[in-house]
């Protein structure tokens, strides 16, 4: 028994009696039981929604394009995703909400790009900014889109500190204690040999375990005790006349000098400077009765997802890498729109094309670039011999 005829009318004979059939490519086809015509109907909006949803899932997933479309080459997926790269990525709204803590960090990516991230203490990514390196101007662009929080956690970048000093001078800064410990390990190594080095390493390791004000007070007392014991050690000097070879390597004059234990000094004065500025234990004192995050791990988790994306989808062009990273970041914003809502807004706005980041090309100098010359150069092994020069001077042949 065949399928019953529906009450839908045929577009050709205008009589009811259409039967639904399918096609190999998935399109819906109808067959009229009266005139025998086979009209078909497509839903571009439904097709686009399915492709766009698969596109976003591919960006956040670990499957290759060949695994997405079931082929070895992935050409079908690339063809279906080709228009998705042009959809503009929505920007996170500027809400003006004042957070207890904001985490700032930069992540260096391929194609000579760096992306600066800001994540709030409640979890969502608040904003991001593309740049070439972590400059103060780039961080100021990030800070301009947010209200000053109570505490901002940073890893110690010079550009970030300068931007905070100029833009948010009254905001309390919390230095990431993990980054402080890593800087100390770079100076001390993991197995210092001197007594001062071992004591500083113990202070650095204990710093990571401080969880309350009493432990912070004990740590600061131990730091003061270290200085009392190793004050003379830290001030020891080596004069150039005592070690001429090292002085030559350092570029010191014969009357010059340098600190003998400069790495130990660097670690101690790093502790002293950060403690004096209140950047070591701000997570305990900024909000009474509340313990905040003491590291930049929340924003480092987002950076890890970006690194994972680039590793799972190698070979992305510069433009596609930027788009993929921004789609990933948008998924971590507060209340991101669904794929259907994104496409609906995109169509209502006239389907605009995603704006590409312009490339800053180096301008030529007023004299212009150096042109190729024809003079012989020693680098090429081409120069006149002395005998030839003498013959040319005397006119002999």
Residue ranges of model-derived segments:
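Acidic/histidine-rich catalytic cores and adjacent linkers
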Residues: 29, 34-44, 51, 161, ...
């Amino acid at each position: 028994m065949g399928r019953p005829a529906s009450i839908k009318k045929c577009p050709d004979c205008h009589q009811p009696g259409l039967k639904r059939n399918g096609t190999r490519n998935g399109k819906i086809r109808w067959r009229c039981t009266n005139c025998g015509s086979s009209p078909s109907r497509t839903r571009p909006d439904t097709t686009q929604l399915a492709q766009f949803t698969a596109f976003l899932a591919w960006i956040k997933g670990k499957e290759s394009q060949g695994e997405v479309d079931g082929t070895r080459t992935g050409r079908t997926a690339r063809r279906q995703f080709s228009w998705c790269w042009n959809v503009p990525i929505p920007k996170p709204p500027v809400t003006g909400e004042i957070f207890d803590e904001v985490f700032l960090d930069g992540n260096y990516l391929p194609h000579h790009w760096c992306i600066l991230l800001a994540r709030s203490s409640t979890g969502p990514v608040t904003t991001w900014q593309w740049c070439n390196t972590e400059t103060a101007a780039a961080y100021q662009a990030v800070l301009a889109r947010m209200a000053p929080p109570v505490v901002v956690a940073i890893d110690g970048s010079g550009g970030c500190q300068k931007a905070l000093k100029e833009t948010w001078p009254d905001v309390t800064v919390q230095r990431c204690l993990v980054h402080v410990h890593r800087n100390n390990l770079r100076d001390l190594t993991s197995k210092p040999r001197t007594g001062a080095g071992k004591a500083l390493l113990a202070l650095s390791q204990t710093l990571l375990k401080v969880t309350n004000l009493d432990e912070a007070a004990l740590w600061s007392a131990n730091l003061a005790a270290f200085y009392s014991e190793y004050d003379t050690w830290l001030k020891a000097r080596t004069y150039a006349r005592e070690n001429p070879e090292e002085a030559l390597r350092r570029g010191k004059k014969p009357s010059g000098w340098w600190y003998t234990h400069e790495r130990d000094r660097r670690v101690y004065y790093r502790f002293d400077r950060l403690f004096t500025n209140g950047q070591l234990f701000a997570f305990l004192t900024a909000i009474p009765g509340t313990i905040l995050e003491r590291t930049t791990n929340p924003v480092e988790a987002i950076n890890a997802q970006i690194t994972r994306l680039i590793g799972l989808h190698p070979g992305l062009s510069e433009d596609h890498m930027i788009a993929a990273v921004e789609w990933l970041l948008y998924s971590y914003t507060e209340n991101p729109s669904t794929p259907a809502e994104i496409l609906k807004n995109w169509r209502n706005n006239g389907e605009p094309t995603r704006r590409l980041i312009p490339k800053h090309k180096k301008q030529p100098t007023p004299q212009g670039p150096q042109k190729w010359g024809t003079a012989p150069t020693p680098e090429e092994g081409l120069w006149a011999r002395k005998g030839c020069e003498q013959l040319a001077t005397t006119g002999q042949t």
